[in-house]
Amino acid sequence: MANRGPSYGSSREVQEKIEQKYDADLENKLVDWIILQCAEDIEHPPPGRAHFQKWLMDGTVLCKLINSLYPPGQEPIPKISESKMAFKQMEQISQFLKAAETYGVRTTDIFQTVDLWEGKDMAAVQRTLMALGSVAVTKDDGCYRGEPSWFHRKAQQNRRGFSEEQLRQGQNVIGLQMGSNKGASQAGMTGYGMPRQIM
């Protein structure tokens, strides 16, 4: 965490709960996908939360990832800077987040820049990358590289059309309880405030 002291008390408890949500197996899967998706000479980071954060922190890997999900010539981030200046790196992270939202990732699935930059919530970073992968698999536009089973396919609209005749036939169906006096009823129910009669 940059320029931030340790947290104490309830802040520490909250931070520990957030850190418990981080998934090391998911990290490996995401790293493999990012390297395969970008198809560039991207170095594989050592395992661990701190290394994963450092690998993504400058924003270049994230920008290359979002650009690789678009056809050539339509990349949303035309210039990727490899600057070591903090504000340039944070700007690249925010460019990635805007491009991910434009791509189709829901706002609720997008992490805050400080979650990655300060390492506050790396689980949120993982959730964003998972959501991005799910949208890419669902779009199925030929730009996704990787195993389709790595991410969940989002549900898509499947409208059904019924003819007038089918709707009329549905009105002729008799419900199973129509005309029956058996099954669930309110017989034996007492009103509120009345004592139970035990004999």
Swiss-Prot record:
Gene name of the record: TAGLN3
Lineage: Eukaryota, Metazoa, Chordata, Craniata, Vertebrata
Protein's name according to its UniProt entry: Transgelin-3
Organism expressing this protein natively: Pongo abelii (Sumatran orangutan)
Residue intervals of the Calponin-homology (CH) domain: 24-136
Calponin-like repeats: 174-199
Modified-residue entries (Phosphoserine), positions: 163
Keyword presence, Methyltransferase: no
CDD domains in the record: CH_TAGLN3
Family per record: Belongs to the calponin family.
Ranges for region Disordered: 176-199
One of the record's GO cellular component terms: actin cytoskeleton
A GO molecular function held by the record: actin filament binding
GO biological process: actin filament organization
Regions of compositional bias (Polar residues) in chain numbering: 176-188
SUPFAM superfamilies xref list: Calponin-homology domain, CH-domain
Keywords of this entry: Phosphoprotein
PANTHER family in alphabetical order: CALPONIN (PTHR47385), TRANSGELIN-3 (PTHR47385:SF10)
